[in-house]
Amino acid sequence: MVLFKAKFSFQRRVKLAQTLWLLSWLSVLVGCLTFGMGIFLKVQLWIHNEVMENTSAHAVPNTVITAGLVGILLGIYAGKVSQASMDVTKYQRWKSFMMPFFFLAILSCLVCLAALVLSVALRGTLEESLKIGLKNAIRFYKDTDTPGRCYQKRSMDKLQMDFQCCGNNHPKDWFEVQWISNRYLDFSSKEVKDRIKSNVDGRYLMDSVPFSCCNPSSPRPCIQMQITNNSAHYSYNYQSDELNIWVRGCREALLSYYTGIMATNGAAVTLSFLLQASVLVSLRYLHTSMDKISGPDDMEADTEGFILEKGVTETMNTTLEKMKGLFMSNQVETAEGGGEAAAAS
């Protein structure tokens, strides 16, 4: 049973070819946008790689980049075919590439869907990766002399200033770690000794945050040391006053930032998917309607176009049989070539 059959006069085929040409180049433009958005997300993930536990989130930009690149190539091909369809002799050169094109176009649509699914599915993975990565970044903040962690302090300070955030979930995350290196502590000082002895793990903990947590918009000089001690600062109440440090955690800030980029990527991929599907359907109609035209004399004849010549199940079975036959013929040719080589030796 033929699915979605339609009759095409010469004028309708011309309009179909023109529409396909327009859709093809729109698909190329959107493919370029999708490719660029994927590259941008990839770069942003790479920039903050030090505060992430793993790189599983990179699957999203990788898929988006693939979808954009394939969309560009298929759009260019479809545009060339639409131009060649006005000349039977030129069109004959493209006919043999039609089935591989349809196969790749369907794969491209599936890649677009995969990119959309990954954008949603990997949000939880990204959040967990940021949670662990930021926790480690805060813990290793002081290790500026340790190989592999030399730039951890710079990365964390830049992150907190750029995203106006402090700590992992909140500024108190800094209270739980020793973020000042021992090389900068005066161990002859009674205050330092008492603070280290008061801690079970022998760490120098204090209710303070790095300078990068300070809010420069605050009219008051930044209170970054002894934050919870009201008596240490004039006219200050930790419980009721608005703190002049950033109170939002960096995990929330980064997750919100990446979620926004992924949403934009999702919109670009969705548009790319719709255009590629439209190009696929239009080219299929053009191909099947041109299939019965054998020469220039038949160009103005009325023809029929369709999406599938048989039902979905029958088409899939036929395609599988063709692929199986092609695979078997390749095996036979390989075996014959091996036998001839053995006989010659």
From Swiss-Prot:
Subunit structure: Homodimer; disulfide-linked.
Name of the protein described by the UniProt record: RDS/peripherin-like protein xRDS35
Record family assignment: Belongs to the PRPH2/ROM1 family.
Keywords annotated in UniProt: Disulfide bond, Glycoprotein, Membrane, Transmembrane, Transmembrane helix
GO cellular component entries: plasma membrane
Source species of the chain: Xenopus laevis (African clawed frog)
GO biological processes: visual perception
Bilayer topology term: Multi-pass membrane protein
Glycosylated residues (UniProt): N54, N229
Top-level taxon in the UniProt lineage: Eukaryota
Record SUPFAM superfamilies: Tetraspanin (SSF48652)
Tissue: Rod specific.
Transmembrane segments: 25-43, 62-80, 100-123, 265-290
Keyword Membrane carried by entry: yes
Keyword Glycoprotein: yes
Lumenal compartment spans: 44-61, 124-264
Compartment list: Membrane
Cytoplasmic side: 1-24, 81-99, 291-345
